Every structure is written in C-alpha cells, then in structure tokens.
Amino acid sequence: MSLRRGDLVTVAAKGPYTGKPRPALVVQSDRLSQLASVTVCPLNGELIAAAPLRVRIEPSRLNNLRQPSDVMVDKLSAVPRDAVSEAFGRLSAAELSLVDVGLRLLLEM
C-alpha cells in the first residue's frame, strides 16, 4: 500500500486514544515508506479550540471528511501498517503546514 504524508486514512489499531477505527492523518516522511509502522495523528469530531495542537479541518472535496474535525497533533503515534486503510482523502498544503507548526511545538524542533 502506498501512503504519502498528508493522506487521510482510517486506523483500526487499539490504543489509549484509539478504541475504535478512526480517521487519522499520515505525518511520517514519504522516505520512510519501507517501515512496518506508520506515524499518524488521529482526527476527532469533538472540536476544541487548542491551536496549534488541534488543527481544525473543514470538509472539502480534497479531504472527503463528512464533518469538521480536529487533527490531534498531541496524540501522535505509530501504528502497524496493516492496521491502516488506503487513503480516503488528503489535507491541503496550507492545512498540512498548520499541522507542522503543532508538530514542531510538540517535539521542540
């Protein structure tokens, strides 16, 4: 399966913040596609104002979301590649740029 940074996928891995299949954003570098895991930030439909650690994404033709959702940048995790679906949408370059701001803050980069 070919995934790219910025893709929106469904993750079906159980974890502290993923009790059910949920949409997530692929944030891992495209150069690391050979890894057995994929680094993602989950999305949540329960919206809270907490920028830059929550990035609001409005539904669009590009992302195929059904409702406004927040990318939970502070819930960054690696999941097994076989628990990740094919991409159902993508973020715009501007939206991904906002996620990058949150990642730099979270990781002190």
What residue spans do the PLM features occupy?
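Conserved functional hotspots at enzyme active or ligand-binding sites that engage polyanionic ligands
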Residues: 1-109
